[in-house]
Amino acid sequence: MVSNWLDAAPRRVLALISAACIAMLAFGMYLQHVVGLEPCPMCIVQRYALIGVAVFTGLGSLRGGRGWWMTWGVLALLLSGFGAFVAARQSWLQWYPPEIATCGRDFYGMIENFPISRAIPMIFRGSGDCAAIDWTFLGGSIANWSFVCFVVMALVLLVMLLRAPRPARGGFSAA
């Protein structure tokens, strides 16, 4: 049933993923501005990945040829994989915190004060803030749930792209 839906409406799937990303970003803003949780550098990178997936899937859901929605879908798939990687790294830091947990620089401080070649490794090394678990739902931290969401989006995109109808080769029709 789900695979039939994926076959019939790839643009609907892309629109649904875009809406889910926007909902997750809105929930992140709620946690930050209403609940008072400050995002760590890895959380901010995950937000950027969500924004990218939302934009690419949103563009893919608009009218256009098959090639366009497939292009946007592939880009969204790559960003979903990147977001899953960052969320997995943050989950690892939460499960196995570093010996010395310090509150490192904030994300924007790292980007502004260090060359990008030094800032990127610092972000992925994490800080004491990245290992902290400030909120849980059903036993999972925000990073755990973010990982699950990124993996589900990546799997849905992958299935959608793999099941996309292929154009006939060589000019022969199957009929």
Curated annotation (Swiss-Prot):
Cystines in this chain: 40-43, 103-130
Compartment annotation: Cell inner membrane
Organism: Paracidovorax citrulli (strain AAC00-1)
Membrane topology: Multi-pass membrane protein
Name this protein carries in UniProt: Disulfide bond formation protein B
Lineage: Bacteria, Pseudomonadati, Pseudomonadota, Betaproteobacteria, Burkholderiales
One Pfam family, short name: DsbB
Keyword Transmembrane helix: yes
Protein family: Belongs to the DsbB family.
Keywords of this entry: Cell inner membrane, Cell membrane, Chaperone, Disulfide bond, Electron transport, Membrane, Oxidoreductase, Redox-active center, Transmembrane, Transmembrane helix, Transport
Signal peptide: none
